[in-house]
Amino acid sequence: MATVDLNADMGESFGSWKAGDDESLLGIVTSANVACGFHAGDAVVMGQTCKAAAEHGVCIGAHVSYRDLAGFGRNFIDVDPGRLRDEVIYQLSALRGIAAVHGASVRYVKPHGALYNTIVHHQAQAKAVVEAIDAVNSATGADMAILGLPGALVLDLAEQQGVRTLSEVFADRAYNPDGTLVSRRQEGSVLHDPGEVAERVVTLVTQGSVTAIDGTKVPIKADSVCVHGDTPGAVAMATAVRDRLASTGIELRAAA
């Protein structure tokens, strides 16, 4: 039986600001990308999210970011690579400690937003992220993988460093012909119809391709499928994807 992981971003509330319906999504997905306080989330929310994920048997990943609360991590920051490495280590260490308190572990790392897109091609920043993961793995005996865009430079560097890699596709995002994501600033970058998105995911998993924004077919490999938790109708979207995969005989299972 074919299997695939379904992941979603969670723990993105902080202080009095609330985002997403994490509790509902945890009943649907198999992996949770938990914000680590740099683009969203705080100590309380991180704890609540890890506890709930553990109770639902959902795999926990660290959703690390540039230090950009004001911009929700969507702004590129030309940060010194050494500082970026240390800030990723900081985020990983915080989430690992909080997860451990709730009887869980952090199994993978998924960079967020602008950082995610930048390390597809930015040598110095991609290297810094890989070094951070490898440093924590080496110091603690952990075996965290990195989850990223297929063909991304960061995945190549991770493999060279001996860090496990996982590739993902986005259920509700449009793709360019080169396999990169269409900028959110461009019209049509985010898909909103649950039925359309669900069919698209089945094609991705069974045929290994996605239709780009210009209509061309792009070969793409996916260990995991991301459904965004902060978009309108996120729960309905995730439910439609899960149900359509199940009806096709595809089993949902955490990749990490």
Curated annotation (Swiss-Prot):
The keyword Amino-acid biosynthesis does not apply. It catalyses: 5-oxo-L-proline + ATP + 2 H2O = L-glutamate + ADP + phosphate + H(+). One of its GO terms (biological process) is carbohydrate metabolic process. The keyword Ligase does not apply. GO terms for molecular function: 5-oxoprolinase (ATP-hydrolyzing) activity; ATP binding. Pfam families: LamB_YcsF (PF03746). Gene3D superfamilies: Glycoside hydrolase/deacetylase (3.20.20.370). It comes from the Bacteria. Its EC number is 3.5.2.9. Keywords: ATP-binding, Hydrolase, Nucleotide-binding. InterPro entries: Glyco_hydro/deAcase_b/a-brl, LamB/YcsF/PxpA-like. Belongs to the LamB/PxpA family. PANTHER family: 5-OXOPROLINASE SUBUNIT A, UNCHARACTERIZED PROTEIN YBGL-RELATED. Catalyzes the cleavage of 5-oxoproline to form L-glutamate coupled to the hydrolysis of ATP to ADP and inorganic phosphate. Forms a complex composed of PxpA, PxpB and PxpC. This is 5-oxoprolinase subunit A. It comes from Cutibacterium acnes (strain DSM 16379 / KPA171202).
